A protein has these predicted regions:
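Alpha-helix capping and helix-coil boundary motifs
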Residues: 1, 14, 162-166
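ATP-binding pocket architecture of kinase catalytic cores
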Residues: 1-7
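Conserved kinase catalytic-core segment
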Residues: 8-74
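C-terminal catalytic region of ATP-dependent kinase domains
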Residues: 53-186
Length: 186
């Protein structure tokens, strides 16, 4: 679990491992935000460690999904803002230049845009189910769509009536603005 990792392993990481983990934390933060996956405190995710030939790879995986598409406060969907993740956030700001952080955010958005385009039918069905279910209170929906409208300037957020509409607007925004940002795009 992330909280155990922060307590036991984080203080002993080499600079190279800190950079690798910081890169993954930036990407995890963006994945949570784009998917409206909230409350990713350190005990709600795991750090998966994979030994490669000459280095260690890190992947952060969510294990608790009960706050997905529920909260109105946009910061709840960004693990970097949660106090339990302060050490990860601090480490990231120290070991990664701002330009690198911005690049990793763009890469994650481009990857999500390509995945969304590739799974259009399945995603459409999921969003339809989300729109038919009341996932959150209307005041939380209004708060979140207002915050995302202010952040992006995209009027599709203003038109959203529920969390399914908000997620659809977010995915549409990502696909329109980041689909071709991937260095691996064909």
């Amino acid at each position: 679990p992330g909280d155990v990792f922060i307590e036991e392993r984080l203080p002993t990481l080499s600079l190279q491992d800190q950079r690798a983990l910081a890169k993954e934390f930036v990407k995890f933060n963006e994945r949570c935000f784009l998917r409206l996956l909230g409350d990713m405190r350190s005990y709600n995710y795991v750090v998966v460690i994979t030994q490669d030939f000459d280095r260690i790879q890190y992947r952060i995986r969510a294990i608790d999904f009960d706050q997905q598409s529920y909260e109105g406060n946009a910061k709840v969907y960004q693990p970097e803002h949660l106090p339990e993740n302060a050490q990860f956030a601090e480490m990231t700001s120290v070991v990664l230049p701002k330009a690198s952080i911005e690049q990793y955010v763009k890469e994650e958005r481009a990857l999500l845009a390509r995945r969304a385009a590739g799974e259009h039918l399945r995603l459409k069905q999921l969003l339809m189910c989300m729109r038919e279910d009341e996932l959150s209170a209307s005041d939380k929906v209004d708060e979140l769509k207002g915050a995302l409208l202010a952040l992006t300037g995209d009027v599709n957020f203003k038109r959203a009536g529920n969390m399914g509409d908000i997620l659809e607007a977010a995915l549409d925004f990502i696909q329109r603005n980041f689909k071709t940002d991937s260095p691996f795009a064909s």
